[in-house]
Amino acid sequence: MWNLRITPLSFGAACQGIFTSTLLLSALTVPLVCTIVYDSCLYMDINASRALANVYDLPDDFFPKIDDLVRDAKDALEPYWKSDSIKKHVLIATHFVDLIEDFWQTTQGMHEIAESLRAVIPPTTAPVPTGYLIQHEEAEEIPLGDLFKHQEERIVSFQPDYPITARIHAHLKAYAKINEESLDRARRLLWWHYNCLLWGEANVTNYISRLRTWLSTPEKYRGRDAPTIEAITRPIQVAQGGRKTSSGTRKPRGLEPRRRKVKTTVVYGRRRSKSRDRRAPSPQRAGSPLPRSSSSHHRSPSPRK
């Protein structure tokens, strides 16, 4: 992809290299607005917004390598591409797939050119300190067309007669560093969006919350293994698959007046003594007291008389 032939005395080629890098700067630098400001323009749930912000704090080794990440994202997006889906996560993930594929190869080429320039830089040349190189946060505030000018002014302030080949090397290292940091943010956002398509935004939000809790807990107080999104979503999948669907339709509630339940109470008669003679059953209603005989209306003579 990159063919570069430089001789130690090719001053004109070195000057041409600076001019060429100025013209190609707009094509070699990742658009920062795509990786920083885009999520503030989208409407999403407050919990999902916090989880998306927490993605930036996860360890770098948590995310797959760029080649593996792009391949996994394409596999997840392929069904949506076939159906021409316009879902939010599909559109944004597709944008980042294209962005990462294009600028990752470009950034790798910039590193290769910078390494090949080391052979023609005078051995006594001191490298440009990091403080004189434009950082990612500063590049966000500088217009893209003025980025080369600002970097050149810093190199001149470090050493006015800095060698031309060393200047090109410093420019390429600064731009490649900016690209790498922008691509890292794009990589994390791509992981978020295509996993939302695979598992659902709510499940990914829950997973990020549990993972951050596990990472912030001291090692002796937490489990040995980190939580996985498969383990979080498995109970939900089992519960949904185990439900039995009824053939009939469920009657909607609230359309008819509610029937009042009638409570039946059975009142039992007095318990009769075993010593008394059993009387024949009377035609009285069950549970009603037995009528007294006519003799029971007269009082028995008092034993005192």
Swiss-Prot record:
Q: Tell me the domain of life.
A: Viruses
Location within or outside the cell = Secreted
Spell out the residues of the site Cleavage.
R272, S273
Q: Which SUPFAM superfamilies match?
A: Hepatitis B viral capsid (hbcag)
Question: What UniProt keywords are attached to this protein's entry?
Answer: Host-virus interaction, Secreted, Signal, Viral immunoevasion
Keyword presence, S-adenosyl-L-methionine: no
Which is one GO molecular function term here? structural molecule activity
Region described as Disordered: spans on this chain: 226-305
This entry carries the following GO cellular component terms, namely: extracellular region
User: What's this protein's family per the entry?
Assistant: Belongs to the avihepadnavirus precore antigen family.
Provide the protein name: External core antigen
The record's gene field reads: C
